[in-house]
From Swiss-Prot:
Its main location: cytoplasm. GO terms for molecular function: iron ion binding; N(6)-L-threonylcarbamoyladenine synthase activity. It holds the Pfam family TsaD. This is tRNA N6-adenosine threonylcarbamoyltransferase. It catalyses: L-threonylcarbamoyladenylate + adenosine(37) in tRNA = N(6)-L-threonylcarbamoyladenosine(37) in tRNA + AMP + H(+). The keyword Ribosomal protein does not apply. It comes from Chlamydia caviae (strain ATCC VR-813 / DSM 19441 / 03DC25 / GPIC). One of its GO terms (biological process) is tRNA threonylcarbamoyladenosine modification. One of its GO terms (cellular component) is cytoplasm. InterPro entries: ATPase_NBD, Gcp-like_dom, KAE1/TsaD, TsaD. It comes from the Bacteria. It is found in: Cytoplasm. Substrate binds at residues 133-137, 166, 179, 278.
């Protein structure tokens, strides 16, 4: 079975082809640059860009893989969660291809696909597993009873960790997106220079808004207000702030995991999303948890269509096809957090 995957949940327009064995034949991603000037994603610009470049992105993927639309057996497309306009462009484009080529189509959950990306490149993953999604828009933990079953354990109550990194990068005068720039700065700084506290939200949930505010006050001063301009910082100060922030942000997640892992009796951990590529985070998890850890390669950490095609193929073969695919900005998973309480 040859599966064509389409991804457009945010600002990446992507197309990939995955063969019958799950091997990636092509993985083309167009990253929009228009948002850099605004310091974040402008939904209307993102939608227009998807509409403009989807045909050429699909054409590039077909050429790279050496196949034609007639060779495709299945079309998989991201339909939730994400920016509603961007999702609508992708879903309708996929429906057009499916109708024109008379191929079956299946909708894929973007967050679940991020976790599947880690599974896709791994071998002999044992279940049940803990799925940890860490991206610009989502921070959540899942019980994965198998590669296709996701039950919500906990999530961020406010900002996602990737979004928090981008906002702190802006405080430090860094361009968007700022995650990798924070990581680079932090490698030259002292993580104990500032005493930023990890999240203290009880139970399985997380919070990053307090940490974000603490960093802002550390830069502006405690007596500042919203109109107080950001001061000029030396490179050494930026590095120390970045390192201290990074430690607190990732510790907020890592400190929760030992108790959760014990509660759900998981046998492995799958980590997905753009933030999963952070080496400091990877090492922290390895030092915190005595379980097999699986991270996607860097090309599959960020938004891509290979993970959409891979998961879509598995869902189709498992007869879990989506009837009536519609774009949906938010998705509500079955939650099992109540059954895990109390957690410290």
């Amino acid at each position: 079975m040859l599966t064509l995957g389409l991804e457009s949940s945010c600002d990446e327009t992507a197309c990939a082809l995955v063969d019958a064995k799950g091997h990636i034949m092509a993985n083309v991603v167009f990253s929009q640059q228009d948002h850099v000037a605004y310091g974040g994603i402008v939904p209307e610009l993102a939608s227009r860009a998807h509409l403009r470049v989807f045909p050429s992105v699909v054409d590039s993927a077909l050429k790279e893989s050496g196949v034609s639309l007639e060779d495709i057996d299945l079309i998989a497309v991201t339909h939730t969660p994400g920016l509603i306009g961007s999702l609508a462009i992708g879903v309708n484009f996929a429906k057009g291809l499916a109708i024109g080529c008379q191929k079956p189509i299946i909708g894929v959950n973007h967050v679940e696909a991020h976790l599947y990306a880690a599974y896709m490149e791994a071998e002999n993953v044992e279940f049940p597993a803990l799925g940890l999604a860490v991206s610009g828009a989502h921070t959540a933990m899942f019980l994965m009873e198998d590669p296709l079953t996701y039950k919500l354990i906990g999530k961020s109550r406010d900002d996602a960790i990737g979004e928090t990194f981008d906002k702190v990068a802006r405080f430090l005068g860094l361009p968007y997106p700022g995650g990798s720039l924070i990581e680079k700065l932090a490698s030259c700084g002292c993580e104990e220079s500032y005493s930023f506290s990890p999240s203290k939200v009880p139970g399985c949930d997380l919070s990053f808004s307090g940490l974000k505010t603490a960093v802002l006050y550390a830069i502006k001063g405690n007596n500042s207000n919203s109109r107080t301009p950001l001061p000029e910082l030396s490179e050494a100060e930026k590095s120390d702030i970045a390192a201290s922030f990074q430690r607190a942000a990732f510790t907020s997640i890592a400190q929760k995991l030992p108790n959760i892992v014990k509660k759900i009796s998981c046998r492995s951990i799958l980590v997905g999303g753009g933030v999963a590529s952070n080496k400091y985070f990877q090492n922290l998890l390895k030092n915190t948890l005595n379980l097999p850890l699986y991270f996607p390669s860097s090309k599959l950490c960020t938004d891509n269509a290979a993970m959409i095609a891979g998961l879509g193929r598995e869902l189709f073969l498992s007869d879990k096809s989506t009837i009536g695919i519609h774009p949906c900005a938010r998705y509500h998973w079955e939650s099992i957090s109540a059954s895990l309480s109390p957690l410290p």
